Amino acid sequence: DGNIFWSFNDSFYGVINENRSRGNCSFPRNSIMVQTPGEKDENLVWLADYVQTNDPNADRYYQVRTHIRHPKATLSDEKIQAGEIDQDYLYWAGDATIYNNQMQMLWGAVDNTDPNNLMRRFGTCLATYSLEGKPGDASYMKLISRNDNFNDHTLGYGDTMWEDEDGHIYLYTTSNYKVAVARTATRDLGSQWEYYVADPQGNFSW
């Protein structure tokens, strides 16, 4: 539709002091934005759930809640509404694609509960968003569905994707400093995935 979608992980939201140092801020584990054509501030449409934007002297001014929470996160709804951020289980953004006039996006599940194995990848969520309307409308980028149990990969397939003319989407990640690749059966991220793997002789195939 001519717009650019941005996703962010572990970002600071809040106020900046006159000397450009960071003031009181929150640290949402993921957030999203749409950039419309142009180079003005109003072309950056932040799809953020702000705690409050009315009183600069009150707590949590322009601080933001995490866009999409992991279902295993343990903070209460009351604490989330107050502006606290999950630190135990979270999602980090993967890549996204357009299918059937909707945006499909992969979110990587991260377990941050083991001090001996922090930031452990343990699965993937497939989320689908509406593209009806225009940025700023309630319908645009509305979350239509999410499959928190899409897969249980410990690798971040789909950190980067390539939509090929052959009808597949190729999903890339790294493992032990080597590239790992999967691909979808169709241009639908929800279609069957297959993996480029080697046999005992080192010959790669799907």
Give the location of each predicted region.
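Beta-rich carbohydrate-recognition and catalytic domains
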Residues: 2-89, 98-152, 164-206
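Beta-rich catalytic cores
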Residues: 90-93, 155-157
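Hydrophobic core register within WD40 beta-propeller blades
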Residues: 96, 159-161
